[in-house]
Amino acid sequence: MGKGPGLDPSWSLAGTPCFKSTRLGKTHLESTAGGAQTGARLDPVQIARHSMCSSSVRLDHGPLPVGVAAMQGETFGPGADSQRSASGAEYQQLTCARLSVRDICYKLHAAARISMESGAWDSEYFDKRATPGVGAVGGSKMPPPHAHGAVAPPPAMYNNPAMESNKDDNFFGAIVLSLRAAQIVFTVVGLGVMGSLKHTSHGDYYYYYYDFSFTQVDSYIGVLSLDVIVCLYAIVQLVLCFIQRSNQGKYLSSPTTVAAKLTFVFDQVLAYALVATAGAAAGSALEIRKGTSCSGTWTVICSKGEASVAMSFFAFAFLAATAAVYSVRLLRITGR
């Protein structure tokens, strides 16, 4: 809009309080229809001309710029006389136009402040209008801000079904407990039978005797050692399952933890080691059976050796089943 004679060239619409002010103070809604306004210095002529315009809204936010201060009767430079000497109609039109612009700015400020104080910006209006990919994930509503100004974290993209996970943990846990118990039973029986493999053979009239023990066969020593290791390992795993049950309410830990991965590796290693030693002991027992030693009183030696090797094979089967259960559970959970 054009400037009147003698006005400061720097004053324009951008210099009005609605564009220039950065601090909002207390809102005063005061009618100036009577020519009275708090803090304003108006001369009689200005009061008369000012009363011809509509009522204005005063926003208490600090000093006004030169152009607005001039409309309230304050001097604004050497052009004051020239403005007062202008025609009454032109000056009245200019003053009313500026007051109208100021009224609009003040009312916009007052409406915005009232809206913010009444919580209009906390409504869900904009959340409902959100489009997919803009401001919300998949068009869902964004969470409202907290009281202290911190924005709440967005909702999780995917939540694992807790009920189904608990059922799977209980199912796999029951299977693992049964397999661990079977490993302990068969390894204990195998090492007990192998440890009792001792026999003394006496000749006629006890002129001579011959002692035989499992320590004389290397493969028997190997299978006995693996039975002890697997038995201790199964006992430790069984105790850890019960500790996990008492602490977290489930028999198995998460397959993504280090303990679960180590358990899977140890199951695989011990299973292969046990089946290897059991196979070697089975070969030795077969060779002893083919000879002439398994006759008479020596039959018990061959039977005990074969029984101990058989128990080791059963223990291997249950240990391999445990490793398979852990692998299936790992693939089932990570593949969801």
Curated annotation (Swiss-Prot):
Membrane topology reported for the UniProt record: Multi-pass membrane protein
Keyword Cell membrane listed: yes
Keyword Magnesium tagged: no
Cytoplasmic side: 1-170, 244-261, 329-336
Transmembrane segments: 171-191, 223-243, 262-282, 308-328
GO CC, one annotated term: plasma membrane
Compartments in which it is found: Cell membrane
Domain of life, source organism: Eukaryota
Extracellular topology ranges: 192-222, 283-307
Cleavable signal peptide: none
The entry's keywords: Cell membrane, Membrane, Transmembrane, Transmembrane helix
Family according to the record: Belongs to the Casparian strip membrane proteins (CASP) family.
Subunit structure: Homodimer and heterodimers.
Protein name: CASP-like protein UU1
Originating organism: Physcomitrium patens
Lineage: Eukaryota, Viridiplantae, Streptophyta, Embryophyta, Bryophyta
